[in-house]
């Protein structure tokens, strides 16, 4: 897999984690099978009894939807910024248990389902 494809796959998987609840069941299934489970278009089409073109169109549409959600809500990009700030604080104050505890709480909030 090319680097650009890996980056896109990683981004789609991340956006899916944040916005899956906003998608239809079909959109969730197709995106998860395609990006997370590495199914081909043909495999997804066969599983759902539709054409490869139908799967392709749905995936492309859903990618645009996920990107639109991120453009409006910034959940993924904000998560990245928060994670970097937490890492910086922990690196600068490694022995501060109060900060460690608070960052641990904030991290657990970010990572809950």
Curated annotation (Swiss-Prot):
Pfam families named in the record: UPF0122
Alphabetical list of InterPro entries matching this protein: RNA_pol_sigma_r3/r4-like, UPF0122, UPF0122_fam_protein, WH-like_DNA-bd_sf
SUPFAM superfamilies per UniProt: Sigma3 and sigma4 domains of RNA polymerase sigma factors (SSF88659)
Protein purpose: Might take part in the signal recognition particle (SRP) pathway. This is inferred from the conservation of its genetic proximity to ftsY/ffh. May be a regulatory protein.
Family classification: Belongs to the UPF0122 family.
Record protein name field: UPF0122 protein Sez_1013
Taxonomic source organism: Streptococcus equi subsp. zooepidemicus (strain MGCS10565)
Source lineage: Bacteria, Bacillati, Bacillota, Bacilli, Lactobacillales
């Amino acid at each position: 897999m090319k680097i650009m494809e890996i980056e896109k796959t990683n981004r789609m998987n991340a956006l899916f984690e944040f916005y899956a609840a906003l998608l239809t069941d079909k959109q969730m299934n197709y995106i998860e099978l395609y990006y997370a489970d590495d199914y081909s278009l043909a495999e997804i089409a066969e599983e759902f009894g539709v054409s490869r073109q139908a799967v392709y169109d749905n995936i492309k549409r859903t990618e645009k939807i996920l990107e639109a959600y991120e453009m409006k809500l910034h959940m993924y990009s904000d998560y990245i910024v928060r994670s970097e700030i937490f890492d910086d604080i922990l690196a600068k104050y490694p022995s501060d248990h109060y900060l460690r505890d608070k960052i641990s709480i904030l991290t657990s909030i970010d990572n809950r389902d």
